[in-house]
Structures are given as structure tokens and as C-alpha cells.
Amino acid sequence: MQRVLELLLLSSTALAVIGDGFIALPVHKLQAGEGSAHFPNRLPIFDVVNGVAKSVEDDVNQIIQPIFGNGIFSGGSIQGTHSGNGHSVKYEVSLPSSSAQKGSNGPSSTDNKDTDPSKTGFSLDDLMNSISTDFWNLIGLNKPPTSSDNGSKDADFTPSAVSQVEQPTSKSVESTAPGSASSASSSSSSEAASSSQPSEDSQPSSSANKKTGAFFLSLDNTQTLYTATLKVGSPAQEVQVMIDTGSSDLWFISSGNSQCKVNGGSIDCDKYGVFDKSKSSSWHDNKTDYSISYYDGDKASGTMGQDNITFADGFSIENANFAVIDNTTSSIGVFGVGYPELEAVKSKYTNLPFAMKEQNLIAKVAYSLYLDSRDAVQGYILFGGIDHAFYTGDLKAFDIVQCNDKYVYSQIPLTSVASSLNNYTNAYGLPAGSNHPKVGAVIYNGTDSFNGGVDLKDTLTLLDTGTTYSYLSKDQVESIVGLYGNVTYNDAGKAYEVPCWVGNPGNYLEFNFKNEQYIKVPTSEFVISVGTYASGAELCVFGILPGTHSILGDNFMRSVYAVFDLEDHVISIAQAAYNDNHAVVPIE
């Protein structure tokens, strides 16, 4: 088996022991312009009134098939052919003799929940033990623990299979799962990557070939928003959309959008791609009008319909509901992953997160977000799973707060914000008229401690990837800015001025959630250079803006690992850990 796995590794197929198949797709970031007023805020404008063991055969099939394809169990060996990345490898893997002796026909084909090896032919532990530790070390993975290792795992997030990934890495992470008081080491290390993608004219897989478990969607960092690439229609058309936890609809810009340059408008619609429904044989127009307005001023109108959407090979939604927009000034569509209550149509429908569970792509309507650092090229949204390598400390769960007895926004209470200043380079000797630091307010002689802060009184706050900056009430923003000196509003930037040195490395804001979780965010995320004073000194404004809704946008979200569970109505958060390792566990 070791030699076969090495051959597969050489053919650019990597392995990871995790849930029943998961895929990684990248998220891209847009480039920021100057100032702050024109960045995306895709919060829709609405008046809101209104752990069971499987049979050994199942376990082994889940592990073998993603690696080798559909092999045949025959006596004490597994035979078959694996194809991928332009390579085809025939294999015959001999099972350990102790296993082969137990049954001439391999594992039982019945749905036997008893995993006793003496009753099922051979055990999953036998298979895992047959792979040498040297091989796991070779590909950069820790050898997965077996029952004989007395290893523990979180009962809420149970790994169940192996999947193909691109970049083998390893990390063992101590973690506490949402809703669980016990801390456990993740029993499966995995690699985030993108599985081989279907060709442009490939058809979405039938439900019989779909995988269940967890899958990544890569998010490309454009500096103002995060974009994901989806394949829609038959044959597939590749279109980028921005990922948005603050809305619920998926919509694509139509090739017929009147605002596109090719149609006489001013928008470069080719930059992120458009959907031409006339070229899709599987498109169905349901004749329902669609219209939505966002707080950043963008609007979109078109019609609702259904078509097939592919995220990665084996992970697709058939007859997904979405809108095709023929009139918008936005250059990119939106992939809303919020509650259905935020849908911009009167008759509610099954949006994509819920359709993923309905069509068995994931076991629970949940996803986790890791945007990585500000300078990172991409982040990830992981549907149906948690990557324990992407955070430090414990995940703390907070109940999502309802709005008028309905789950509408993914909002949790924000208790307070404090500041720590440890780097005073260029803090003094500022020109007259500039925003001098208020000595004694938050300057603690270089110590990493807090003598104060701003009490936000558990303000309900939306965690929103569709918003570039963050928003609090005018009074709250002024209180935070007041920690740094004079409170001056800049009309041109539509934001409050702040001393540029506050953004020095080593300075940070600490966000307190119910005195249970504290997230540190570098102040550089909130200090935005927008020009110069008349004196020539640099002018900066604060990246928490005054608004009617409390929103923690991308400049906060990059510092947190967040798990959105729309089924149990909780959001779990922890301090983000920037690295390239993975330890993925599907949520069951």
C-alpha cells in the first residue's frame, strides 16, 4: 500500500484523513481604492417586522474510494484503478494478514453497525496500521490515531473518511468544539486544497455520485471584498461572486445587464464573469421578479430561476435557486449564505446553505470562515466542517439573537472594545492642528494591559464578510476614537480622523464578547491613510464607521475564526491562527 500511495503522491494527488470527501476552492480579494465611503456594504435594506459508528465496509469505502476510485474488494486485497491529473495507476493492495484471514469476501455488505473486527472481516484500524508511519511523515501528515492509541476526539465533529487535497501539511491542534466543554486533540490532520476541477463543459454529478462531508470554497482577497468561483449551468460557466454572510440570496450578473460596457454601460462585467442563461440547457426561469438594495447604494434587479451549480468535482447542487440580474451597477454578483429570512423575495425558498444539506453535500447547515491576514492572497469558507488548525485557544459558542422572534441576522452581543498601544513611533512631534494622542487614555508605558475601554453594553453585532469596514453607532465610534485624542469627523472620507501612528505594529484593539471570548485585532486594520494635511503630514481615518447597524466587517473578520451554525443557531469564534496547515473535521 505504501508504494501505491507514494505513486499517487507523485501524480500530484495528496491525502488527508478527514470526513467523507472535502474540497478546497480559493477566495479572492479586490483591490482597495482611496477613502472609505465607496467600499462594499452588502447588508440588504429590509424592514424586518415580521456520532454513530458506521459499518466497517462503509468506513473503508469512504477512505479508499476518494483515493483510489471505485476499487473491488477481493479476498485479502483491494484492487482497482485510480485516475487523476493525467495519470492512471493500477493497484492491488494486500490487507494485513490478520485481517485477510478473517473473511474471504472482505467486509460484510450489510448495514452492520457493529465494528468488532471478528464480526466484520477486518477493522479500520487494521487498514490504517498497514500504512507505515514513514509514509505519513513523507507527505507531512501525522499518522491518524486508531482506537488502540486511546486518542480522543470531539463528539460533535467526527472525522469519517479520507479526501484528496493538494498541499500536504500537518498540525495537531487542541480544541474545544462549540457546545462542548471538553478539550480534545483533533484526530485527523488534513490539507486544504482544491481537488481536480471539472472541465467547463462538464455536467454536475448526479445525486448518486455526490459526496457528503465538508468542502472548502476558496475566497480570493481583493482588498475590498472576497470572491469565490462557482460553475453554473450546462455546460458550466465559471463566474466569480462575493461571499456575504450578511445576506441570503445568490445572484449572478447576466450577460444582458444593461450596465455592462458591452451593452453600452460603464461596468466591466467581464472582470468577474457573467452568466448567459441562454447557453445553459438546464436553466429554468420561474418568472419571478427579483430586486434588492444594499446599504452601500448598489441595487440589482432581474428574475429568479433554477440551474445546476458545481463547487468542485462531486460537490454540486441541482436546480439551485438564484437570480440572474439584468440591471445593476455592481461589477460582481453576490453569494449570500445567511438565513432565508433575508431573502429578497416574498415567497421564501431553499437557499444554498440549506440546499447543501437537503441534497446531502453536508450533514448540517453550518460553515466556518477563515479569511487569513490582510496581505494573504486567499482565505476559505468551509461548508459542513471546522478546520481546527485555523484558530488558537478555544472556540466559544454564542447564541444568535433573534429579531422579532425570527432568525434574520447572524448577530451576537459585543460587550466592549479596549485598546492596547505598545508602539509609539512617530507619536509625538506632530504638526499643530493634527489629532494628537491623548496621553494617559490608552498609553500604558508600553505595557500590554488595559486601563480602560469602551462599554458597548452587549450591542447586537452582525459578523459580515460582505462589508469591507466595520460599523457601530456614532456615539460608540466617537468613544473609541476619543481614546486616541481629539474627535474630528472628516467629511471627505466620511469617517473619523485618527493619528496614523496608532496603526503601528504591536498596537491592537481587543473585542470582548460577553466576557467569554476576547479577539485581538491589529489597529492597522482600522487605520486608513486617505491623504495629507495642508502641512504635509499624513492623514488617516478610522475603519470603524458610524452607522445605523452594528457590523463587524472584513477588517475584524480577518482576525477571527468563525463557525456559523444556522441549524442550531450559534456562532462560535476564536482567535485566528495564520498558517498553511489543516485539521478538518466535518460537523455532524
UniProtKB/Swiss-Prot annotation:
Residues 1-16 form the signal peptide. It is found in: Secreted. Residues 83-124, 144-209 are annotated as: Disordered. Residues 17-211 form a propeptide. Residues 180-208 have a biased composition (Low complexity). Its EC number is 3.4.23.24. GO terms for molecular function: aspartic-type endopeptidase activity. Optimum pH is 6.0-7.0, the pH of the saliva, for cleavage of both casein-resorufin and Hst 5. Keywords: Aspartyl protease, Cleavage on pair of basic residues, Disulfide bond, Glycoprotein, Hydrolase, Protease, Secreted, Signal, Virulence, Zymogen. One of its GO terms (cellular component) is fungal-type cell wall. SUPFAM superfamilies: Acid proteases (SSF50630). Induction: Expression is regulated by SSN6 and induced during host infection. It catalyses: Preferential cleavage at the carboxyl of hydrophobic amino acids, but fails to cleave 15-Leu-|-Tyr-16, 16-Tyr-|-Leu-17 and 24-Phe-|-Phe-25 of insulin B chain. Activates trypsinogen, and degrades keratin. One of its GO terms (biological process) is proteolysis. It is an enzyme of class 3 (hydrolase). Pepstatin A binds at D244, T245, G246, D464, T465, G466, T467, T468. Glycans are attached at N150, N286, N308, N327, N423, N445, N486. PROSITE patterns: ASP_PROTEASE, PEPTIDASE_A1. It comes from the Eukaryota. Its main location: secreted. Disulfide bonds join C260-C269, C500-C540. The active site is at D244, D464. Belongs to the peptidase A1 family. This is Secreted aspartic protease 7. It comes from Candida albicans (Yeast).
